[in-house]
Curated annotation (Swiss-Prot):
Name this protein carries in UniProt: Probable Xaa-Pro aminopeptidase P
Annotated EC: 3.4.11.9
Gene: ampp
SUPFAM superfamilies: Creatinase/aminopeptidase, Creatinase/prolidase N-terminal domain
Any Pfam family: Creatinase_N
Family stated for the protein in its record: Belongs to the peptidase M24B family.
Species annotation: Neurospora crassa (strain ATCC 24698 / 74-OR23-1A / CBS 708.71 / DSM 1257 / FGSC 987)
Amino acid sequence: MRSFWSFPSSCLTAVASSVPRPASRSQAARVLHNLPRALTAFPQPSRTTRAFSLTSRLFQHLRAASDEETMTVNTTDRLAALRSLMKERNVDIYVVPSEDSHASEYIAECDARRAFISGFTGSAGTAVVTLDKAALATDGRYFNQASKQLDENWHLLKTGLQDVPTWQEWTADESAGGKSVGIDPTLISPAVADKLDGDIKKHGGAGLKAINENLVDLVWGDSRPPRPSEPVFLLGAKYSGKGTAEKLTNLRKELEKKKAAAFVVSMLDEVAWLFNLRGNDITYNPVFFSYAIVTKDSATLYVDESKLNDEVKQYLAENGTGIKPYNDLFKDTEILANAAKSTSESDKPTKYLVSNKASWALKLALGGEKHVDEVRSPIGDAKAIKNETELEGMRRCHIRDGAALIKYFAWLEDQLINKKAKLDEVEAADQLEQFRSEQADFVGLSFDTISSTGPNGAIIHYKPERGACSVIDPDAIYLCDSGAQFCDGTTDVTRTLHFGQPTDAERKSYTLVLKGNIALDTAVFPKGTSGFALDALARQFLWKYGLDYRHGTGHGVGSFLNVHEGPIGIGTRKAYIDVPLAPGNVLSIEPGYYEDGNYGIRIENLAIVREVKTEHQFGDKPYLGFEHVTMVPYCRKLIDESLLTQEEKDWLNKSNEEIRKNMAGYFDGDQLTTEWLLRETSPF
């Protein structure tokens, strides 16, 4: 294994490294947080350190790591302490969301409050604690994991199943009889807070109360991990394709359109994108704790200034951006609120824009409903449409990523079949990371690799743990969902393989999923079509047999940013209805099928939305389609050709030819990988 957070010389100006002690294997693999690097300028900025590898000391820590994904934590004392604090503050029900104050999907360990109080470590879920009950709500991806991790104090709410209440409904029901509900206002959006408050009152509750001190933090006490404070670095024009000055100009045009005085930027990836900066405060996501305020004539970045080197400071100054401490944000929003209140009654009220994902606390600090408009972030919309530099970077990095995966799958088959090696899921994932690290501009993983054999593949977000995971069974389906961060792009790919002889049922299931992937990949649709409208294309072949999967079909992907990026996606979420796909979007196409206790199948490619030529243009609209950039073949022995149409076979042949062409030169002298690639891409 060679696991590191590497900073190629073409990506950074200067780097120095240090290796901390991780508490578990998954923490160690989370290179963005747990392998922090000191990014400092050298006397000659052009000279850099290429990469950082783990020391033998780190290997020892990895081997000693605990099995955090299946361990049940006794939460009795934690709940008792929380309930004591609730009583002191006259709170009958306390809500603990998963998010941090920036609405991040992936969070720093210091913000893992829901995991701490409940013991459930999945990325999605909400805990609700009353004075005598506790409930944890999560979606279908995590039913199995939550069932294993929650102790007897907790009731699992399986969100999405018939007759199962949402956490909001459960909370409102429990509030009957005048009970008060409390929440940290930095961890909930105004829209969710307003609706929850209304639902509580409809059920006879006292309403939702903002509790400005986080009660879980008080229970956590000195054991709570410190907030990360890793260095921030500049992403050059070679990778960003657009300067901060231009991005600020475009944002100010949006302020003019909406007649707003300022936009308060609260999403970490939006701050990073706007200022062409990257960090490593959040696991797998190259972001850093920060806010920003952009007015018609100023821009201010709120960040711990000690994280910025001279190059970053100079870049910000050249692009008209000031720097203030991270903790000054709420003080300055209150100044804006007071300025807005001072306008005369005859004037139209001053309006400030915030993202519809911004916190309730931020809206309150800016003056509330009168002075705040919650909007779909104009930065998020702009970020989702990649420029040509970013798109070309995505194409390039996926070729390199594909080379690493092809080499890995050939190696894994050889180890299991020819050498009869006994490899567990983590050992295999370690080797994949090693192969990726050998590629140019590799920085780290984009999420924890899902290396899963047999029944583990049916756990949609399964995470193997060192010393407590399964040995890969060559006679069972193997599902590998993985991704990487490169300076020129972010990857996310899933392939499902079989190293022995699959059953007819397994081949049929795999082929139905593959047909759905092809159907969506080849779809042509008018501009203005949303991912909501396209979702059924990927499910249609499963539906014919009464089958389905409990996750979305696709999500947006950042450019050397978050692997899950809004506002676009393909699925049945209401949010996707109002956001049409547009040329320049990059998103995943990943249908699947899962049999609990047996196996999981998922096939995932990343694709660019682009304009396509059609014979006609009804409605004088451009028509759009997809350009897939993932360069990894499908498992030949799992494909039942009898279920494929000739068009689907032609598509596979064209795709395989493209993969072989792009892999030219990558495996010179590597007979094992070359033979594997030729076999898996042989014509149908």
